[in-house]
Swiss-Prot record:
InterPro entries: CRA_dom, CTLH/CRA, CTLH_C, Fyv10_fam, ZF_RING_GID. The gene is FYV10. A zinc finger (RING-Gid-type) spans 430-496. It is found in: Cytoplasm; Nucleus. Residues 117-140 are annotated as: Disordered. PANTHER family: E3 UBIQUITIN-PROTEIN TRANSFERASE MAEA (PTHR12170:SF2), MACROPHAGE ERYTHROBLAST ATTACHER-RELATED (PTHR12170). Involved in the proteasome-dependent degradation of fructose-1,6-bisphosphatase. PROSITE patterns: CTLH, ZF_RING_GID. Pfam families: CTLH (PF10607). One of its GO terms (biological process) is negative regulation of gluconeogenesis. GO terms for molecular function: ubiquitin protein ligase activity; zinc ion binding. It comes from Debaryomyces hansenii (strain ATCC 36239 / CBS 767 / BCRC 21394 / JCM 1990 / NBRC 0083 / IGC 2968) (Yeast). This is Protein FYV10. Belongs to the FYV10 family.
Length: 511
């Protein structure tokens, strides 16, 4: 069945329940630790009071008051954790209710059958094994795509996908346009805040922006410490990437002595294979290769500083050879932004693994599914259309996705293969060919359209395909012209009005 059903939407939205579930587990473990810590602390303090019988009564009262205050603080923390747990559970309930609404928008196909059922098909005579539960029947029914409420439901889901994308892809540290959009929509639809884990995504985006834009390690270090136990079990390499970036930052700032001390404590252990588990040998090889370059980097910095100091003077021949060597340029590359890209990708990988979510934007996943069902071999693959080749060349020269000039892509004159559209003074509105979706649809598979809507199709020299009957029997308006053309062995394209010889037409067999 090609029509969407309730079951289809349940399957595609399972990831929406993973994050709240993981947050509940995480919060529960934190509460357990708080209780154990408080229990141990109170036990030790009470033991001290009991053990010292010679303590003055005033001091004992003071110690007991401290115990009461610490317990009150513990109660506040516990209440905060309980409230947090209730928020996470309310999100799961809201998402279940949101999916449950779909049961009201299905096509009612069994109403007539039930009313016309014969008396023989009574409950007593019916085979129980053949009876399907009503809930399962509702879930397998196709959705009524003409239902206004269902259209509004889809519109809400589209807004959620857009908000999700905007929050995650934000590149500004001062504001997040995705959160602003969510706040605006939630004023009229308060349930929106429970249908998306905006706070977690906002925290993710802040850490990512702090790494890739601000080159700041404080937020990613805090996130690592918060999730240290999971990352250790997952054999994460994030700690090494953080320490490696910290070391290179110290080198870049010129604090060589501090960098050497830092590397001895925080980087040297990663060179020992015995500190890795059997599943981490790939991390060991990668880390070891990076550590080998550290010593040469110090030499590079010394030679580079000396060369900069002697700009107006002649550089020694030996130093000149080193500076112009390919290996020297490799050390220079270590201090580029590649290290921050590597750290950001490592953070994304660990974040998605922690919460069991996809690294791709859900909006892109849905768009890809729709585009691949529309994509044909005629889409922007016409060899006469060179605009996309020009785009590829310009994109290779500037790979930064945030700073790329999109003026070329948004100009309507650059849309798709417009060979025939120009003749009609129209624009190609194919979404696959559109500049906005070109990059996303570029590597998608073609749609497998195995059914031809034409009877006895023929291809004209201009590439257009029509049923041969339509070419021989045009409308009454062009009947006299048709007879004249046929006597000359010619036919006219109904769309472009171009005239071709019948012998130049080719019988095609669409696959």
């Amino acid at each position: 069945m090609s029509e969407p059903t309730v079951n289809f939407h349940i399957q595609t939205r399972l990831t929406e329940f993973k994050i709240p579930t993981e947050l509940i587990k995480k919060n529960f473990k934190a509460v357990q630790k708080q209780i154990e810590k408080q229990k141990k602390s109170i036990g030790e303090d009470v033991a001290k009071v009991k053990k010292n019988n010679k303590l003055p009564t005033a001091m004992k009262i003071e110690m007991i008051n401290k115990l009461i205050k610490s317990f009150e603080i513990f109660q506040k923390r516990l209440r905060t954790s309980i409230n947090r747990d209730e928020v996470f559970r309310s999100r799961i309930i809201a998402r279940l209710e949101n999916l449950s609404e779909l049961a009201n928008y299905t096509v009612k196909t069994n109403v007539v059958l039930e009313s016309n059922a014969s008396p023989i098909d009574s409950d007593d005579n019916r085979d129980e094994s053949s009876v399907t539960p009503k809930s399962m029947e509702d879930e397998d029914r196709p959705l009524d795509l003409h239902n206004v409420n269902l259209i509004n439901w889809y519109r809400d889901q589209t807004n959620l996908l857009i908000i999700d994308y905007l929050i995650k892809s934000n590149t500004r540290s001062d504001q997040n346009i995705g959160l602003q959009l969510l706040k605006s929509i939630s004023q009229t639809n308060p349930k929106f805040t429970k249908l998306i884990d905006y706070d977690l995504y906002d925290n993710f985006n802040k850490v990512f922006v702090s790494i890739i834009e601000n080159h700041d390690l404080s937020l990613v270090i805090a996130w690592f410490n918060e999730n240290r136990s999971f990352l250790k079990k997952a054999n994460s390499n994030l700690e090494f990437e953080i320490n490696y970036c910290k070391f290179l930052s110290l080198i870049e700032e010129g604090d060589v002595n501090e960098a050497i001390k830092f590397s001895q404590v925080n980087l040297s252990p990663y060179g020992n294979k015995g500190n890795y588990q059997s599943q981490e040998f790939m991390n060991h090889e990668s880390n070891l290769n990076k550590l080998k370059e550290i010593g040469g980097l110090l030499v590079y910095m010394a030679i580079n500083e000396k060369a900069n100091a002697q700009i107006d003077k002649s550089i020694p021949f030996s130093s000149s050879l080193v500076i112009n060597s390919p290996r020297f340029k490799e050390y220079k590359k270590l201090l580029s932004n590649e290290r921050w890209d590597s750290l950001s990708q490592c953070f994304i990988e660990n974040f998605t693994k922690l919460y069991g979510i996809s690294r791709n934007y859900p909006l892109f996943i849905y768009l890809s599914a729709g585009l691949s069902s529309l994509k044909t071999k005629s889409c922007y693959c016409n060899t006469e259309n060179t605009i996309f080749k020009q785009y590829e060349e310009s994109s290779e020269s500037n790979k930064n996705i945030y700073k790329k000039d999109l003026a070329v892509l948004t100009d309507k004159k650059y849309r798709g293969p417009n060979k025939y559209y120009k003749l009609l003074n129209k624009i190609n509105h194919c979404p696959v060919c559109s500049p906005e979706l070109y990059k996303l649809s570029k590597n998608l598979p073609y749609a497998q359209l195995i059914t031809s809507i034409f009877n006895n199709p023929f291809k004209l020299p201009n590439g257009n395909i029509y049923p041969f009957d339509k070419l021989l029997n045009p409308s009454e308006k062009y009947l006299s012209e048709k007879n004249t053309l046929l006597r000359m062995g010619k036919i006219k394209d109904p769309l472009t009005r171009e005239i071709f010889l019948i012998d130049d037409c080719v019988r095609v067999y669409p696959a």
